[in-house]
A protein has these predicted regions:
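Bacterial N-terminal signal peptides
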Residues: 11-20
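Bacterial N-terminal signal peptides that target proteins for export
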Residues: 1-12
Length: 463
């Protein structure tokens, strides 16, 4: 991709900046501790830059909006042919709007929904998450119009606009308004109603909302995006310069201050134009080693932050931010949904060479106000297990059958076990393949979740 604003500053200005402001990059290499700190402080921004760019700019992404200020709207349920996103699910369908707020505010009109769970989540490059609307707060019973803007939106500073129900300030010029809708696929009539409502979501600029043409958007070249490792070992500092120029930082926030300090050390500061001659030349092999270490730690620690992830600015700790950025950007905070990894009774990894059963009595069911689901993935790519039945999860949305006592037995098996309802069977292909079983609890009773014991998958003995 064409480099962003290369060699912009003329030599005399560069000299002035070097002498007058001390902004030249340090000549020495970063210590291991300094490099690790830089990677940790940057991870959330790299992850969200890749995520948002993938939504808005990558036409091959199955969730692509094909540009900014547009919306991806699903037309049906997801199946195992979707491989571009890890951890897919049909519990909630994704309605993704990508926002460019530089020139003017953007208005999104949301219809009412006939659903137990609908949650609107917003995030910008900093990966702090807000929930402006949710059925957990009584929203989506009637149509709602939300106006989005940032601190740099031209000609607008948050004043009321006739016809707008809520004004919401984003923490950056580029962001996403991510709607999750439980489709209630087990009820054809309700499912059809919710799919119709999804198609009614409307995105327009404030000018368009007021009956005028949209203001022309200034052209902008985005640095290369891809996987997190690709960015860290590629155009890392160019991406970070772009990101900090389009992000609102709070001088009173400790994480913001620490991130800016780490970036300043390598020549990246808000308001500057990227100049490869004035940033630290990082050793890619050292960066790769550091990123792998940070990512591995984040993945290993994910379950430690079930109640501390995907929160607004000021409510996040660095380790929780890294864990959420590594495992899956723009997830739900604990008051909306909690994701639990299901282990085995013998402590061994689940494998498709064997069958398993997960048992829960009525009193052992997850404490969900809305609903819960158990979804099966392969353990390597975290994708659906292909099967002719297109059965990937058990729960109210995908189908479940409780026993007479109100409990449930969920079987993971290559063949449907005798006497087991099809609703409670998760098919696998008999081979040496790691499995991943994930429980999602929507609108959880959080205090009960803190003491609730997750079930274990028990290996079924061969007859």
């Amino acid at each position: 991709m064409q480099r962003f604003l290369r060699n912009w500053v003329i030599a005399s200005l560069m000299l002035f900046m070097a002498i007058g402001t001390g902004n030249t990059a340090p000549a020495r290499d970063l210590t291991d501790a300094e490099l690790t700190n830089l990677v940790k402080r940057s991870y959330q921004y790299v992850a969200l830059y890749n995520t948002l760019s993938g939504f808005a700019l990558n036409d091959k992404n199955p969730f692509s909006t094909h540009g900014w200020n547009k919306t991806y709207k699903p037309t049906g349920l997801t199946d195992h042919t979707v491989t571009a996103i890890a951890g897919p699910n049909n519990d909630t369908l994704y309605v993704i709007s990508t926002l460019d707020l530089r020139k003017e505010p953007v208005v999104i009109s949301y219809p009412s929904f006939d659903s137990k769970f609908v949650s609107l989540e917003t995030s910008s490059y900093d990966h702090y998450c807000e929930i402006p609307l949710s059925t957990t707060k009584g929203d989506f019973r009637k149509p709602t119009r939300v106006l989005y803007y940032s601190a740099r939106t031209e000609g607008y500073n948050g004043q009321p606009v006739p016809g707008i129900d809520q004004v919401f300030q984003m923490s950056g010029d580029f962001g996403s308004a991510f709607l999750r809708v439980m489709p209630q696929a087990n009820d054809p009539k309700v499912f059809a109603s919710n799919m119709k409502a999804i198609q009614a979501v409307k995105v327009e600029t404030l000018s368009e909302f007021q009956g005028r043409p949209a203001k022309p958007v200034d052209p902008l070249t985005f640095p290369a995006y891809g996987t997190d490792m690709n960015v860290f070992t590629g155009d890392f500092l160019e991406v970070m310069q772009f990101v900090v120029n389009h992000t609102t930082f709070d001088p009173a926030d400790e994480m913001d201050r620490a991130a800016l300090a780490a970036l300043k050390q390598v020549g990246v500061e808000p308001g500057k134009k990227y100049d490869p001659t004035k940033v630290t030349q990082l050793d890619k092999a050292r960066v790769e080693k550091s990123v792998k270490q940070v990512a591995d730690e984040g993945q290993a620690n994910r379950n430690n932050y079930l109640f501390d992830s995907f929160r607004p600015k000021g409510q996040m700790q660095l380790d929780a931010m890294i864990a959420q950025s590594v495992m899956g950007p723009v997830g739900q905070p604990a008051d909306q949904a909690i994701y639990v990894q299901i282990g085995t009774s013998d402590g061994q990894p689940t494998n498709a060479k064997y069958d398993y059963v997960v048992r829960m009595t009525k009193d052992q069911l997850p404490p969900a106000r809305a609903f819960w689901s158990m979804t099966l993935y392969d353990g390597d790519k975290y994708l659906f297990i292909p099967n002719p039945q297109k059965k990937y999860s058990v729960g109210e949305n995908a189908g479940q059958k409780l026993d007479v006592a109100g409990g449930i037995e969920i079987y993971i098996a290559a063949e449907q076990p005798p006497g087991v309802p099809s609703e409670n069977w998760l098919p696998i292909n008999r081979k040496d393949q790691r499995l991943n079983l994930r429980l999602r609890v929507y609108d959880p009773e959080t205090e009960k979740m803190k003491v609730w014991q997750a079930p274990k998958a028990v290996r079924v003995a061969k007859p």
